[in-house]
Amino acid sequence: MSSISVGQENSGSIELYYEDHGKGKPVVLIHGWPLSGASWEKQVAALLAAGHRVITYDRRGFGRSSQPSTGYDYDTFAEDLHKFVTKLDLRDFALVGFSMGGGEVARYIGTYGSKLVSKAVFIASVPPFLLKTPDNPEGVDGSVFEGIKKAIAADRPAFLTAFFNNFYNVDVLGGKRISDEVVRYSWNIGVAASGKGSLDCVSTWGTDFRKDLSRIDVPTLVIHGDADRITPMAATATRTHKAVKGARLLVVEGGPHGLTSTHADKVNPELVDFLK
C-alpha cells in the first residue's frame, strides 16, 4: 500500500493513500465527498489507455487514508495536496477535481500558483461560492448546511442512502445508466469514511473560492450535468466558467451529480481530448 505522510496527530502520522499508474503526462484526480480515489475507476481506465500517468489519492478522513480529528478545511486540503505533489516530485501535471475535489483545484492554484500545473478541470464542482451572503445572494442559505449536519450527526448511514439516490438521480437513471450495485458500492465507501471528517466537511461547502478562481491562468475545462441535484449548475459551473478566463464549459444533458459514473461515455472522451 502506497502512502505519503502529510502531518502528525499526537503519536500518529497522517497518511494519504494513493495509487500511481502508467507513464506520460501526469494527471492528478481528486475525488468528491464522501468517496475516495476508487470513484475515478472509469476515468483512470480511459486516461491510462490514452497514455497518461494517472494518480489518485484519498483525501484525509476518506478511503484508505488516515482519519485524523482535525484539518477538514480547504487550506489544509490544499496544503496536503501541495505536500503530496512535492513528495512525488510532479511537474507539468493536470489537476482534475470532482465535486468537493474542485475546491482543492481552486485553492491549490490560488495559494501555490500554477507554475507546476499544466491544466485544470472542474467536474460537478462546488466553486465558486455556495453559501448565501450579502455579496453572494445566489448562494444557498446557511440553514441548509446546518440541516445536513444535523442529519449526518443523527444517522449518517441513513443520510447517505438518500444522498446517493440524489447523487445519481436513481429515480430517473436507475437500471439505465446506474445499477443498484454501483449505488451500494458508493454507499459502502462513504459510510467507511471518518464520521467526524464527513461532518466537518459540510462546513467547507460554504468556502469562498472566487479569489482562487481569478488566479487560475492555465487552460481550464468545466464539466457539469444539467440535472445535478447536489451542486446545481447555475450556482456552480455556470459561474466558474465565467470566473476563469478562457475556460470552456461542457454541459452534459441529463447528467446528475455523479456523472463520472452515469455518463462516463460523455465525460471521458472530452476529458481525454482536453488533456492530450
What are these regions (language model features)?
Residues 31-33, 93, 97-102:
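Conserved alpha/beta-hydrolase "nucleophile elbow" surrounding the catalytic nucleophile
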Residues 10-70, 84:
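Conserved HGGG/HGGXW glycine-rich cap/lid loop of the alpha/beta-hydrolase fold
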Residues 245-276:
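Catalytic active-site module of serine/aspartate enzymes centered on a nucleophile-bearing elbow/loop
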Residues 227-231, 257:
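Acidic catalytic loop of the alpha/beta-hydrolase fold
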Residues 106-111, 115-154:
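Flexible "cap/lid" loop of the alpha/beta hydrolase fold
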Residues 216, 222-224, 228:
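Short beta-strand/loop motif that positions the catalytic acidic residue
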Residues 76-93:
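Conserved acidic catalytic loop of the alpha/beta-hydrolase fold
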Residues 128-131, 135-139, 150-214:
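Conserved alpha/beta-hydrolase catalytic His-Asp/Glu region
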